């Protein structure tokens, strides 16, 4: 088929199970060319939100994506830009709160702006009738700013490079890929006003235990001599194996990352992480209908070690010495996502659930130990009905969870000091947001013009139940899109 298709670009991507993994040579397992461009704007409002989110935000951006198959090679690429702005924001100073094992919180509400740029490019080629070679790069950069004391400016970079190779014969395909990743973020804070000592910050070292003091105090690490802000980074290496036989596809990926906070000799934290990801799917046809059964798994284990540092100044030169380290935090996450999807000429149906368990342990001050277990689930159903030039969309999801915590004091022959400081209000709010029962309803309408141009409007409503710490129970979203889509079968 060539020309304009009712299927969206994400449908084209999901039809090929190899796109879930790291091996770009898998794009050659399908022969549909697709090009897509989108302009969008969205608005969010409501007080059912996390501690670092704004009650009102707006976003606008553009996205372009393409998959192209030529005679002996295939190309895939994308580019996107997004600008998001929110008022009266405080809490986490990081772009992706929770991504790293430490966090910095500030408490003065103000406007924050986030700009994100991303680029992805990949190429795969036939070496001979049975072997394929390819490579893919994903790059994203972001800057985040707040213009009210304590004001801060963040810069973040994410990079992943994944070369891969595939052997295929008939309906059998086996792939192998190497994965290199790097991410980094720098938080630079300052105060323009004169009341510098009145602004506090909190360094969260796990489960909201940490250091609470003035923003430029030595325990926060935002204003240390010789160091530009609070730099943090991760470097990872890994590999992946892919296998396909007829309609069955499976892969497994493993990466090990070395993370650190600080720079040069002054490294405050080191946090190695092991991650395993697996995608399993089965695809079959019944007439003109296609059915997909998927099962995705993710597991990660992280430990965070805080270095014991001292500084010595000799002849005007300050040197930092590391005297050892203490393991202050440990986290294990497991997520399972079974899913079923039906694709037909009349529409699509998709349903599934996310089941996640979290185990966290903090031991940042001997002999005090705190551990937490959390379970979260989200079940979702979505559908699209094609009726001439109109596509009707609907989705509903329900989330719930629970958590428990245990605190104990290890045996010691000495008198223990005061327990570590805890930001209890924020801890309770974030726990409730993660585990509260909530339902989300989404409706959308898409109108298809000629030549692949279409416009789409969407609206969603989220309601939280039985809340104690979150300010409100409702959250609304409205989105409008203008898009261009073209698909065709490769020659």
What do these predicted ranges mean?
Residues 1-87, 100:
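N-terminal, post-signal peptide beta-strand-biased segments of exported outer-membrane/organellar beta-barrel
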Residues 24-35, 66-76, 126-133, 168-175, ...:
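Short loop/turn motifs that connect adjacent beta-strands in outer-membrane beta-barrel proteins
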Residues 124-148, 156-162, 251-266, 350-358:
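Surface-exposed extracellular loop regions of Gram-negative outer-membrane beta-barrel proteins
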Residues 82-115, 177, 184-187:
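Outer-membrane beta-barrel translocator/channel fold
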Residues 96-106, 204-343, 348-485:
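Outer membrane beta-barrel transmembrane domains
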Residues 182-208:
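A surface-exposed, glycine/aromatic-enriched loop/edge motif typical of exported proteins
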Residues 45-59, 110-112, 142-156, 228-230, ...:
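Outer-membrane beta-barrel proteins
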Residues 486-491:
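Conserved small/polar residues in nucleotide/adenosyl-binding loops
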């Amino acid at each position: 088929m060539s020309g304009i298709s009712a299927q969206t670009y994400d449908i084209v991507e999901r039809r090929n199970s190899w796109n879930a993994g790291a091996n770009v040579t898998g794009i050659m397992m399908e022969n549909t060319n697709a090009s897509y461009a989108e302009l969008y704007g969205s608005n969010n409002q409501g007080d059912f939100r996390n501690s670092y989110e704004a009650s009102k935000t707006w976003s606008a951006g553009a996205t372009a994506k393409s998959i192209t198959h030529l005679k002996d090679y295939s190309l895939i690429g994308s580019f996107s830009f997004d600008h998001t702005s929110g008022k009266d924001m405080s809490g986490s100073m990081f772009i992706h709160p929770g991504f790293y094992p430490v966090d910095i919180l500030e408490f003065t509400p103000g406007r924050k702006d986030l700009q994100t740029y991303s680029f992805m490019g990949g190429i795969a080629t036939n070496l001979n009738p049975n072997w394929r070679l390819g490579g893919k790069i994903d790059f994203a950069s972001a800057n985040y700013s707040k213009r009210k004391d304590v004001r801060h400016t963040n810069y973040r970079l994410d990079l992943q490079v994944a070369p891969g190779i595939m052997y295929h014969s008939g309906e059998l395909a086996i792939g192998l890929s190497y994965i290199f990743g790097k991410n980094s973020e720098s938080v630079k804070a300052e105060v323009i006003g004169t009341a510098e000592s009145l602004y506090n910050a909190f360094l969260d070292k796990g489960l909201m235990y940490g250091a609470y003091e003035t923003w430029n105090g030595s325990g926060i690490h935002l204003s240390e001599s010789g160091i530009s802000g609070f730099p943090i980074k991760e470097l990872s290496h890994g590999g992946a194996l892919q296998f396909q036989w007829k309609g069955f596809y499976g892969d497994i990926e493993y990466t090990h990352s070395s993370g650190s906070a600080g720079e040069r000799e002054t490294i405050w934290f080191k946090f190695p992480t092991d991650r395993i990801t697996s995608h399993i799917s089965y695809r079959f046809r019944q007439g003109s209908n296609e059915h997909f059964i998927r099962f995705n798994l993710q597991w990660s284990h992280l430990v965070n070690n805080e270095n014991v540092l001292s500084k010595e100044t000799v002849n005007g030169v300050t040197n930092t010495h590391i005297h050892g380290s203490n393991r202050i935090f440990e986290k294990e996450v497991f997520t399972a996502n079974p899913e079923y999807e039906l694709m037909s000429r009349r529409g699509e149906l998709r349903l599934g659930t996310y089941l996640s368990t979290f185990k966290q342990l903090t031991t940042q001050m001997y002999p005090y130990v705190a551990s937490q277990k959390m379970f979260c689930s989200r079940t979702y159903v979505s559908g699209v009905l094609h009726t001439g030039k109109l596509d009707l969309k609907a989705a509903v999801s329900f989330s719930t969870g629970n958590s428990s915590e245990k605190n104990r004091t290890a045996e010691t022959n000495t008198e223990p000091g005061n327990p570590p400081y805890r930001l209890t209000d924020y801890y309770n709010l974030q726990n409730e947001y993660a585990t509260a029962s909530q339902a989300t309803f989404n409706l959308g309408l898409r109108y298809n013009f000629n030549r692949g141009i279409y416009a789409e409007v969407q609206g969603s409503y989220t309601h939280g139940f039985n809340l104690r710490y979150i300010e409100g129970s409702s959250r609304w979203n409205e989105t409008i899109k203008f898009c261009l889509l073209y698909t065709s079968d490769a020659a």
